Amino acid sequence: MADQESDKSIEIWKSFKLIKGLESARGNGTSMISLIMPPRDQVARVTKMLADEYGTASNIKSRVNRQSVLSAITSAQQRLKLYNKVPPNGLVLYTGTIVTDDGKEKKVTIDFEPFKPINASLYLCDNKFHTEPLNELLESDDKFGFIVMDGNGTLFGTLSGNTREVLHKFTVDLPKKHGRGGQSALRFARLRMEKRHNYVRKTAELATQFYINPATSQPNVSGLILAGSADFKTELSQSELFDPRLQAKILNVVDVSYGGENGFNQAIELSAEILSNVKFIQEKKLIGKYFEEISQDTGKYVFGVDDTLKALDMGAVETLIVWENLDINRYELKNGATGETVIKHLGKEQENDQSNFHDAESNAELEIVEKMPLLEWFANEYKRFGCTLEFVTNKSQEGSQFCRGFGGIGGLLRYQLDMRTFDELSDGEVYEDSD
């Protein structure tokens, strides 16, 4: 199933698209209401405030503007009636009359609970929607794990934004190397190795305890940094005792001069650049894995809109990879003559070709029932196909190659699939209903 990290990045992307759409909307006069309520605010307080605002707005001299403002306040009041209390993450409400691209007026009302708590309170009537407070939703709150390990002990910590937290630390008393000769030398060496092994095992077990969420069995951090002054950190990273789910999350192994909290601070400084580029690194890793499947011709990959959608329908896609600026729209078209509905995915050039909006056999015109960016459709529907959805940029070399060479859409599959077989089947129209 889709992991939490992937879900969160999709929510951020949805919020970004919504904010951009709201930002560009404009209205006549001051008939556009922006209302943001933080968690634990009272619906009754805002309802009373809107009633007071209604009284004030009744005195606006311009009849057209007065009616627009009163209409927007009424819409806000009606929408608030749907809520008994403010949702746990707060409530965002935008309502008013906007002017569309072709100069027509259109009423819009958008209300939603943000995907994480919003710490802002706002009420404004203007000729635009105010989305500035929503920008905090777009800020990454990725959490990173740190394991600082040396010959004296280990510290487990996390870093999220500028907040660092020490989860646990313990000390260890390891025997030092010494020059005693004779038969005791081997025994001492064996004891020393045994204690080292136990130390690494304890650290590995605690790492699983702190950095794996027991509810999801997935890491609760976006990445791991291993730090230390001796070679314990390297030993841990390569150890079979270290949880493979965490091994996959290692971003960096750094040398620090100290152990404990001083070592933690130094590790944060030394990893600053890597942490700021973590999305970039994850993207390179993901697309690198995709290219590896292709170069080895494993059959566990798919690319292009049609093949990717076929594989999705079969439940074969484990990770759906899509360029964040993919410019393809999903059309639901209806044949007026037969009542049949078809789905088409068209790019800009294809949209200009009118033959795509006519039935190939009868030349009957196809009516547009729904038009939606394919990206948006994926963001809403991906969970239905049991896959994770990853948006990638074209800023890395790998990302650019994925967009140019593979059309910016593809997937890693759960099992081997030869899409050519399916193309031949569909060409032969084997999928026709027998009844």
UniProtKB/Swiss-Prot annotation:
Directs the termination of nascent peptide synthesis (translation) in response to the termination codons UAA, UAG and UGA. Modulates plant growth and development. PANTHER family: PEPTIDE CHAIN RELEASE FACTOR SUBUNIT 1 (PTHR10113). This is Eukaryotic peptide chain release factor subunit 1-3. Gene3D superfamilies: 3.30.1330.30, eRF1 domain 1, eRF1 domain 2. One of its GO terms (molecular function) is translation release factor activity. The modification N-acetylalanine is found at residue 2. Keywords: Acetylation, Cytoplasm, Growth regulation, Protein biosynthesis. InterPro entries: eFR1_2_sf, eRF1_1_Pelota, eRF1_1_sf, eRF1_2, eRF1_3, Peptide_chain-rel_eRF1/aRF1, Ribosomal_eL30-like_sf. The gene is ERF1-3.
